[in-house]
């Protein structure tokens, strides 16, 4: 297995670098792509499936993914990738709308693309174009494509785009069948998808969300309850603590009580988990802290209302208050496509912002969440092509 994968990786890397080599006057003139290579790991072998494509040589999934990853799009600064996608998708004959999310301090736009003039479609492929900090440059190492967003979630964006382009070239989708939606702000507060829910005025029967699921169908994922706690004390000399009140000590004690609380569990999603992400405050070691702050993130498996009540009992007091940053319940998803593996996920997505709509919702995408957000984020070549195949399969299943 190791030898077969390494040979495949070598062929892909050599082919890609020959294709994009600056030594050449331009892309190799192979006419039209005959290496729309989609690799599928089947049992103990790597099988190459070649799709004859109507897309010009040099215009392929790997080069689109490279372009996306090379554009820095940290949360709050996504305008360059939005503009790139608008130009790219228009060049493929799609109608493209930029939905303004905010203009201050920077322009932030969602991207919505479809065939012809029919804005409402049966299926929408959607993902997010923002990434976490810090930006990491694009590079290839063996069969791995590194860079910030290479996995989460520009692999999904690229694979979804090529799924639509290939289905168009194969004559399998018509106006009103399929659209693309790429949003900003997923990694921070979901502002992009919230704006879609409130203002886009487009309807779908099926939404396929793109996130790293190792190309498995998500059965469900945990919810988010994220909040900040502000504690208030009275500063005094630490030699006379009875004269004051330490905001830090109070905050720590309340956080320990939260950590010791048995939060609601789910048979499917497992336990709710708590992370005290940051604690800050105080002026010096010899002064009782007058102010303190903690950032808390609870991954909610069940009964988010009860968990919120617990947090408010602990932190909405005469000495402190909470500010809710994110509040979204656990999600239970559609996974009815025969022959596709499934997975339960501990992270959260933008799905809750559309969950009140009467439509089917799927979660699927290339890459592993374990490789996302870290200093060595990557997706493999085979994962990208498998993701492309998976999106096409899901679209066609729901258009049948």
Curated annotation (Swiss-Prot):
Keyword Protease: yes
Pfam short name (any one): Peptidase_M20
Record-level GO BP terms: cellular detoxification; glutathione catabolic process; proteolysis
Gene3D superfamilies: 3.30.70.360, Zn peptidases
InterPro entries found in the cross-reference section: Bact_exopeptidase_dim_dom (IPR036264), Peptidase_M20 (IPR002933), Peptidase_M20_dimer (IPR011650), Peptidase_M20A (IPR050072)
Entry binding sites for Zn(2+) 2: 152
Name of this chain's protein: Peptidase M20 domain-containing protein C757.05c
Organism of derivation: Schizosaccharomyces pombe (strain 972 / ATCC 24843) (Fission yeast)
């Amino acid at each position: 297995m190791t030898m077969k994968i390494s040979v495949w990786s070598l062929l892909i890397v050599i082919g890609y670098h020959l294709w994009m080599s600056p030594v050449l006057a331009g892309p190799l003139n192979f006419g039209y792509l005959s290496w729309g290579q989609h690799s599928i790991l089947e049992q103990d072998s790597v099988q190459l499936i070649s799709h004859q494509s109507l897309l010009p040589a040099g215009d392929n999934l790997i080069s689109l993914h490279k372009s996306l990853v090379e554009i820095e799009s940290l949360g709050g600064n996504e305008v360059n990738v939005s503009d790139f996608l608008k130009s790219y998708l228009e060049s493929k004959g799609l109608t493209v709308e930029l939905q303004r999310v905010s203009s201050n301090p920077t322009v932030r736009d969602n991207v919505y693309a479809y065939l012809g003039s029919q804005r409402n479609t049966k299926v929408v492929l959607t993902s997010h174009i923002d990434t976490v900090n810090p930006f990491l440059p694009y590079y290839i190492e063996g069969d791995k494509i590194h860079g910030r967003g290479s996995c989460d979630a520009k692999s999904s964006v690229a694979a979804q785009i090529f799924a639509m382009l290939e289905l168009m070239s194969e004559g399998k989708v018509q106006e009103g069948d399929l659209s693309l939606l790429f949003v900003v702000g997923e990694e921070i507060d979901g502002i992009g998808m919230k704006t879609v829910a409130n203002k886009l005025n487009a309807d779908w029967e099926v939404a396929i969300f793109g996130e790293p699921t190792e190309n498995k169908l998500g059965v469900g994922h945990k919810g988010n309850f994220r909040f900040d706690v502000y504690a208030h004390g009275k500063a005094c000399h630490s030699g006379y603590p009875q004269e004051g009140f330490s905001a830090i000590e109070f905050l720590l004690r309340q956080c320990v009580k939260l950590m010791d609380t048995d939060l609601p569990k789910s048979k499917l999603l497992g336990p709710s988990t708590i992370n005290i992400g940051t604690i800050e405050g105080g002026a010096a070691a010899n002064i009782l802290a007058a102010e303190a702050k903690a950032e808390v993130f609870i991954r909610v498996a069940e009964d988010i209302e009860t968990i919120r009540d617990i947090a408010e009992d602990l932190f909405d007091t005469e000495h402190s208050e909470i500010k809710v940053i994110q509040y979204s319940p656990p999600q239970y998803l559609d996974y009815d496509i025969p022959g596709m593996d499934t997975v339960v996920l501990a992270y959260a997505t933008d799905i809750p912002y559309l969950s009140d709509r009467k439509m089917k919702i799927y979660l699927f995408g290339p890459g592993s969440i374990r490789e996302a957000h870290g200093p060595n984020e990557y997706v493999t070549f085979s994962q990208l092509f498998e993701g492309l195949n998976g999106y096409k399969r899901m679209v066609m299943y729901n258009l049948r």
